[in-house]
Amino acid sequence: MVHGTAVLKSEYDGLGLSVLWVVPNEGTKGVVQISHGMSENKERYLPFMEYLAERGYICVIHDHRGHGGSVHNREELGYLYGGKNKAMVEDLHQITIWIKEIFPDLPVYLLGHSMGTLVARNYLKYFDNELEKLILTGPPCENPAVDLGLLIARTQKRHRGGRYRSKLLETIIFGTFASRFAGEKSRFAWICSDEEVVKAYEESPLCGFTFTADGFEGLLMLLKETYRKEGWRLQNPQLPILFLGGEEDPCIGNGRKFVKELQYMRQVGYRHVTGKLYPGMRHEILNEKDKLTVYRNIYQYLEK
């Protein structure tokens, strides 16, 4: 397989978007575009990308703005450059168009994780006709406190500036996640049951950073727009959509809330929405101890 990288200039504001891809040596079946989660970087998905590439799928991922290589400097990790939710969605779509220009005859599948599912679902409102299938892992559930969070983010942004790192919002949003695993060593224990994965995440300068007020505003706008019933163009109601999560993932809430996420997409008008929860797994099911089971399930879904 062949690995490659590039930097594309965002059509939204000119920010450099760092892109990584893996291409099979032969027999390409399609392209899997990946939309990663909050406070992480694209390279964490390489094992999964290589697994799919070995089975005939090209994989492409870019660092969302404010992440990995899509920043002017590392001091701006967690800063969205004032682009809010709109820029992240437009960036994702720009990468899709770029993929289609290079591989015009191949179907494009989109996989989003965590915050990346919010970007993907916002994208879906406008561009569902670009995709063959959509897969969502660790999808955040609806949160009734989203407006309060937005008020805090905007107040902090106004008084302290967009680059101010909001420990308050970090605690409000993620404090309860950590408290579910309070007996474990790391405050990031909620992301994965594999301590080595958590340790690597904690030690990486590209992971676990606190979002800025500007970043939290964008994140919360993504969350709010995901669950706003207005604005869905529904150009492709036949699009197959698969929700996947870990039963012990506090981000999806619980089994009942997970089912509500599926039901919501059906209410919007999508006719082929399915889901699966994995016992014993936490937030990052692609990094869990039994991740190969998840890899296989995703591969089988792509092959259907």
Listing of model-derived features with the role each one plays in the protein:
Residues V268-K304:
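Catalytic active-site module of serine/aspartate enzymes centered on a nucleophile-bearing elbow/loop
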Residues L80-E101:
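Alpha/beta-hydrolase active-site loop
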Residues F103-S114:
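Alpha/beta-hydrolase fold nucleophile elbow
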Residues V32, H36-E40, S114, E247-E248:
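Active-site glycine-rich loops that stabilize anionic/oxyanionic intermediates
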Residues F243-G245:
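Short beta-strand/loop motif that positions the catalytic acidic residue
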Residues A120-L206:
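Alpha/beta-hydrolase-fold enzymes
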